[in-house]
């Protein structure tokens, strides 16, 4: 919605407001990444760049990664999430669809094969989900985006 301008009438999340979930997600992201490393033994590195799809016909596809997983053949991307009392309901049956699409978009831009999504639910339960590259979904995203 941001890319198309359809978000113009919607309220904007305030990352400086300590009552906002966005604020807490930003504060807790490094802690979630550290806990992921401790639980999996995988090393992660913060990605401080906007990545662009290498195909000139898809140059409009950009991605912001939270972390890259280094020296691991099974997984290359780490997406960190937090969810409070209400947001955690979306995670009852696994990774919500909108997060699945976000991660498939990241895999499309980077050419990577798999990502882990690490979510802190209600500030005390950490869950890790593996998302493998799905070419059919990526092709659908190309059309939709």
Locate each region found by the language model.
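Gly/Pro/Ser/Thr-rich low-complexity, intrinsically disordered segments predominantly at protein N-termini
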Residues: 33-35
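Nucleic-acid nuclease catalytic cores
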Residues: 22, 38-65, 69-144
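Charged, glycine-rich intrinsically disordered N-terminal tails and low-complexity linkers that flank
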Residues: 1-27
């Amino acid at each position: 919605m941001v890319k198309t301008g359809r978000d113009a009438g919607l309220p904007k999340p305030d990352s400086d407001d300590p009552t906002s979930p966005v604020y807490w997600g930003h504060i807790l992201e490094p802690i979630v990444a550290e806990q992921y490393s401790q639980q999996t033994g995988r090393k992660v590195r913060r990605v401080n760049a906007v990545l662009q799809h290498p195909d000139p016909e898809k140059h409009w596809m950009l991605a912001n990664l939270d972390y890259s997983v280094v020296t691991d053949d099974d997984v290359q991307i780490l997406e960190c999430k937090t969810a409070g009392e209400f947001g955690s309901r979306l995670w009852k049956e696994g990774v919500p669809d909108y997060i699945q699409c976000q991660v498939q978009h990241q895999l499309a831009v980077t050419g990577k094969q798999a990502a882990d999504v690490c979510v802190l639910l209600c500030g005390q339960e950490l869950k890790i989900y593996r998302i493998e590259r799905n070419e059919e979904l990526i092709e659908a995203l190309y059309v939709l985006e």
